[in-house]
């Protein structure tokens, strides 16, 4: 099954302020019917990057069978980690960046890699706050969740 996933994360007073994530999942069933599911949640103390990662994690966790997933995100942090293969280098170096400093949010990156396992996932960057309807919806879900 092909799934399109739009994700966004938000944090107020980044770092360590309240934050939230938003996810919009789309898939078309065998009869040609479009299905949409929205996910969001807020947290008291977090960062924007953790919320960006959690959005993708929660979206993938919502899938009940192996899928071909296209993730649309305005987070260069998330998209470039895969499309520029930063993550491959981090894993090879024991979760250290090329400058030997530890990778931040290792717990979330490991969790993301784990939930990606049954799926074929590709990442596409979209410019945030640029009128893309699903990205705007994810932003609304994330900021509303962050505001509690």
Give the location of each predicted region:
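RNase H catalytic domain
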Residues: 10-16, 57-137, 141, 146
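RNase H-like nuclease fold core
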Residues: 1-50, 54, 58-67, 140-148
């Amino acid at each position: 099954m092909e799934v399109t996933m739009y994700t966004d994360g938000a944090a107020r007073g980044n770092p360590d302020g309240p934050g939230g994530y938003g996810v919009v999942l789309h898939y078309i069933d065998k009869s040609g019917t479009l299905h949409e599911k929205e996910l969001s949640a807020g947290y008291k103390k977090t960062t924007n990057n953790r919320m960006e990662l959690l959005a993708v994690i929660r979206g993938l966790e919502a899938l009940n069978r192996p899928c071909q997933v296209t993730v649309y995100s305005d987070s260069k942090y998330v998209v470039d980690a895969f499309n520029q293969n930063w993550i491959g280098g981090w894993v090879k170096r024991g979760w250290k960046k090329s400058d030997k400093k530890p990778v931040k949010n290792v717990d979330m990156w490991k969790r993301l890699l784990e939930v990606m396992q049954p799926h074929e996932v590709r990442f596409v960057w979209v410019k945030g706050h640029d009128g893309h309807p699903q990205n705007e919806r994810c932003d609304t879900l994330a900021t509303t969740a962050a505001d509690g």
